[in-house]
Amino acid sequence: MTTPACFRVCEDFTDRYTDVKMSGMNYAFFCPAFTKRPPYYHNTRVYSCILLSNDIYESGELYWRGKFNEDTDLSLRVMKGGYHTYLFCAMLCGKVATLTMKGGNTKEVYGIDQAGTKHDRVGGEDFDHRREFAESLHAQHPDEVRITQKWGRWHHHIDYTVFQNKKPTKKPDLNIPKGTNNYGMKLVKLKSTTPLDEYEELNVE
């Protein structure tokens, strides 16, 4: 996509509701082109590319906290507070895989001295805080989080379906025009490029 209209699409959809306080775009590598996904998921975790309602800060009830899984923790607290989230699949973000870029948590949390793929990064050989990540989230939400193993590594597991029965509240003055609004975007065929090996990148986490 070569336009910022995707942000406007997500913002306008989120603004249809009074109680959707958190939304964002899914990762492109979680939605490969050969798979089918709904345009959005309701009441689930939102990672990295996040739109937050300012009033959750003004009220003082929701804020960033902790060192690990901050976005998952905040997503859970939003939903447990009676609010709603949307994770968009119609619009995706091309997040760089964890540990492949310096800065952020690469050094402080993951212990990586030189960012890169799993084949050429430096440092962190004995560093695997995955269980600590999972235990930290479990301590914050023992009612919702299970510690499990997936693909031979420690992970947290959350059943988000418990939050998905209640529908968000549309604004009383909401008027959605008939027809399709493409926000000025056009679908065009681009020149062939060499795509990233998505599954290879997923393996670096």
Regions found by a protein language model. Name each.
Residues 66-205:
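C-terminal catalytic/acceptor-binding lobe
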